[in-house]
Amino acid sequence: MGLEKSLILLPLLVLVLAWVQPSLGKETPAMKFERQHMDSAGSSSSSPTYCNQMMKRREMTKGSCKRVNTFVHEPLADVQAVCSQKNVTCKNGKKNCYKSRSALTITDCRLKGNSKYPDCDYQTSHQQKHIIVACEGSPYVPVHFDASV
């Protein structure tokens, strides 16, 4: 009797695991935003090689060089709070963008003109600017970095 139950439960367990497993390793838009744009520690953000190191570490130079990226050096909670601040229109025309009330510490990374994959070389620029992020979900969190102004 015990063996029969095991033989019935095993295929059921396999089905459940097959259904659950794909979602386990999937990066959500909010997780992608954090990976690509958040660096609260910002420990070496003043280094001229900061962008080269971070763009590689955060997997934005796999297969091609991402042309432009911004890292925000503020606590995640402060960046998430932007989603309840001034509503503005996104560059793509959508209405789910929000502008920070105050200037935040950021680092802009721009691909140098003569740089080609796989040798992605970035110009590092440290600034204090307002950020504009697109927000979605429940809870309402940043999912896209739209601009810095």
Curated annotation (Swiss-Prot):
Pancreas. The keyword rRNA-binding does not apply. The active site is at 37 (proton acceptor), 144 (proton donor). Glycans are attached at residue 87. The lineage of its organism: Eukaryota, Metazoa, Chordata, Craniata, Vertebrata. Transmembrane segments: none annotated. One of its GO terms (cellular component) is extracellular region. The keyword Nuclease applies. Residues 1-25 form the signal peptide. Belongs to the pancreatic ribonuclease family. PANTHER family: RIBONUCLEASE, RIBONUCLEASE PANCREATIC. This is Ribonuclease pancreatic. Its EC number is 4.6.1.18. SMART domains: RNAse_Pc (SM00092). GO terms for molecular function: lyase activity; nucleic acid binding; ribonuclease A activity. Keywords: Disulfide bond, Endonuclease, Glycoprotein, Hydrolase, Lyase, Nuclease, Secreted, Signal. Disulfide bonds join 51-109, 65-120, 83-135, 90-97. It catalyses: an [RNA] containing cytidine + H2O = an [RNA]-3'-cytidine-3'-phosphate + a 5'-hydroxy-ribonucleotide-3'-[RNA]; an [RNA] containing uridine + H2O = an [RNA]-3'-uridine-3'-phosphate + a 5'-hydroxy-ribonucleotide-3'-[RNA]. GO terms for biological process: defense response to Gram-positive bacterium.
